[in-house]
A protein has these predicted regions:
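N-terminal auxiliary "cap/dimerization" subdomain that precedes the catalytic jelly-roll/cupin core
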Residues: 1-84
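Signature of the catalytic double-stranded beta-helix
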Residues: 55-132, 150-151, 157
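Residue-level detector of short, conserved catalytic/binding motifs and their immediate flanks
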Residues: 110, 161-163, 167, 215, ...
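Short His-Asn-centered micro-motif
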Residues: 115, 165, 219-221
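Residue-level signal for short segments within beta-strands and strand-turn junctions
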Residues: 116, 182-184, 246
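Catalytic core of non-heme Fe(II) oxygenases with the double-stranded beta-helix
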Residues: 122-210
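Catalytic core of Fe(II)/2-oxoglutarate
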Residues: 190-257
Length: 257
């Protein structure tokens, strides 16, 4: 089930985007995956997909040392620049759960997905076409699997009812959102890889959950989902979101990415 919580004001979102842009030298290019490539006889273009922050599903799954390196370098920056938004997020979720919520200090802090060009440039036509395709994988969130050793340091850990959340900071002109399905699937098969043959196995119809700027969307557990592609994208469109996960450890929700 999808839950919605108004989290940031318009002013907050504008301030956050400005800070994200000012940190663009720290953006990590994630466009190397083939599904983000536009290829013809003349060139191969990479659609602009970046993250600000270390990411379990991109870094730790491929190279745990890279995840550790990124989080060690970027966590202090994120805390310095975005501690105020972490306080808001924790406060909002504490109201939702009636339980303590903290930013975990050991794992990577919640960060940003950035589907956009850097300030001063616009999306090229081939990028617009790519972003109107379903680039995101159909998957369930199992990022916690990358950190089993850490979870074992706590007495009680709930890895069934884990938290995933997204907060849109900027959205394309015609919006964005999340597809979800009710199907119960094998996480090993419905992971972060390509979508080949996945949709053929699903019995339930997809549900379109449209985003609202500044409004958190979150869910608990292994909900099957996929990033919705763009619609009638414009060269100046941007899709910037805060992303994070949470695990309840010894009665405290610990947020990470």
């Amino acid at each position: 089930m999808i839950h919605r919580v108004k989290t940031f004001t318009e002013e907050d979102c504008n301030k956050i985007e400005t800070i994200v842009d000012n940190l663009d030298k720290l953006w990590i290019n994630r466009s190397c995956e083939r599904r983000f490539a536009f290829e013809n006889s003349f060139k191969i273009s990479r659609a602009p997909f970046w993250t600000l922050g270390a990411v379990s599903y991109l870094d730790s799954t491929q190279d745990p040392e890279r995840y550790a390196k990124h989080k060690t370098y970027l966590n202090p920056v994120l805390i310095k620049k975005f501690n105020w938004i972490y306080e808001i997020i924790c406060e909002k979720l504490q109201r939702e759960f009636s339980e303590p919520v903290v930013i975990d200090k050991f794992l990577a802090h919640p960060g940003f997905h950035i589907f956009a060009t850097k300030t001063g440039s616009v999306l090229e036509p081939e990028y617009l076409k790519l972003f109107e395709e379903p680039l995101g994988s159909v998957h369930v969130d199992v990022q916690y699997e990358e950190h089993y050793d850490y979870w074992h340091s706590f007495k009680e850990v709930d890895l069934e009812n884990t938290l995933s959340f997204t907060i849109p900071i900027n959205l394309p002109t015609h919006g964005g959102g999340l597809y979800t399905w009710e199907d119960i699937v094998d996480p090993l098969l419905f992971n972060y890889t390509t979508n080949e043959n996945k949709l053929d196995e699903l019995e339930s119809p997809s549900v379109s959950n449209l985003y609202n700027k500044g409004e958190m969307i979150y869910f608990i557990g292994h909900l099957l989902h996929q990033m919705m592609p763009g619609t009638q994208l414009q060269p100046t469109d941007r899709r910037i979101t805060v992303q994070g996960h949470g695990v309840k450890c010894d009665g405290v929700w610990r947020l990470y990415w």
